[in-house]
């Protein structure tokens, strides 16, 4: 059982991980590859103390080196959801599950909005992971809405296990609606109806309230108190996912505070 799992490996996540480690907590970070980060693409970062005119790539590489030197486990992948298990949580990443006592969300800005019917049919025909749920649709018709780099290969995986796949890349349609009664029966893409048994929505990131459905958000941002606690006991958040200002220094400070709060929560149980 890990003490703290951190979702996101940017400035807030790295700061939280190092702080938690220094407080003798076991830590895992689950994060997309650094290359998918908006910070990685920044040519120059001019306002982070001690690192004048550093590129985003250089800064993230330094963060990852510090994580490695501290012996903190970094799992590259997309965290799909977290299931409350009494006083602990089970976090899924691909086909793997990781148990922990507390979660810190440092997922950055989630720019994608959910589609009509997406939340309603999650687990009832809507999935975020072809590898995890593909076999449930063997011999059936599925739609894949591909919004990340791995989407095309995941669509091919579904075909290889016997699914009839209708693939939508990010340019094929602008508007989607998922339809059904108790389960998914169709996808409407730009007013064209496609009868399907399932819809795989493959994004680089997942909206926080899809990851934890009971999590309180406002305008897509996670609501936290002054100690970075969220509406769910044992879940904390830091960085851009909690709202403006979107600054590296702010994210680092919030990550530090979230780890202090998460550590105190664990110690007080």
Question: Where are the regions that the model predicts?
Answer:
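A Rossmann-like FAD-binding core segment of flavoenzymes
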Residues: 38, 61, 67-85, 90-92, ...
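Short, glycine/charged-enriched secondary-structure capping and boundary segments
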Residues: 20-21, 42-45, 117-121, 157-160, ...
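FAD-binding core/adjacent interface of flavoenzyme oxidoreductases
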Residues: 1-5, 74-140, 189, 200, ...
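Glycine-rich nucleotide phosphate-binding loop and flanking beta-alpha elements
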Residues: 13, 110-111, 150-151, 206-207, ...
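Beta1-alpha1 glycine-rich phosphate/pyrophosphate-binding loop at the start
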Residues: 2-58, 140-172
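FAD-site-proximal beta/loop scaffold in flavoenzymes
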Residues: 120-136, 202-245, 249-250, 257-260, ...
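Short glycine-/acidic-enriched loop or helix-start segments at secondary-structure transitions
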Residues: 16, 39, 84, 114-116, ...
């Amino acid at each position: 059982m890990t003490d703290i799992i951190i979702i996101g490996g940017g400035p807030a996540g790295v700061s939280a991980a190092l702080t938690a480690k220094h407080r003798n907590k076991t830590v895992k970070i689950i994060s997309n590859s650094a290359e998918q980060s908006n910070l990685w693409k920044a040519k120059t970062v001019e306002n982070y103390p001690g690192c004048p005119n550093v590129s985003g790539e250089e800064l993230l590489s330094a963060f990852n080196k510090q994580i490695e030197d501290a012996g903190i486990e970094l799992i590259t992948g997309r965290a799909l959801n977290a299931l409350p298990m009494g006083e602990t949580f089970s976090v899924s990443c691909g086909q793997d599950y990781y148990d922990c006592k507390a979660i810190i969300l440092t997922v950055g800005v989630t720019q994608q909005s959910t589609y009509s019917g997406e939340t309603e049919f999650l687990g009832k025909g809507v999935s975020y992971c072809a590898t995890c749920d593909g076999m449930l649709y063997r011999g059936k018709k599925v739609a894949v809405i591909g919004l990340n780099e791995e989407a095309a290969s995941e669509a091919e995986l579904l075909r290889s296990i016997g699914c009839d796949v209708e693939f939508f890349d990010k340019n094929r349609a602008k508007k989607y609606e998922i339809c059904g009664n108790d389960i998914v029966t169709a996808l409407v893409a730009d007013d064209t109806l496609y009868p399907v048994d399932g819809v795989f929505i493959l994004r680089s990131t997942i909206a926080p309230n899809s990851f934890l459905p009971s999590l309180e958000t406002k305008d897509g941002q996670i609501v936290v108190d002054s100690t970075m606690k969220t509406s769910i006991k044992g879940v904390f958040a830091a960085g851009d996912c909690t709202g403006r200002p979107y600054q590296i220094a702010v994210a680092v400070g919030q990550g530090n505070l979230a780890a202090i709060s998460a550590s105190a929560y664990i110690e007080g149980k």
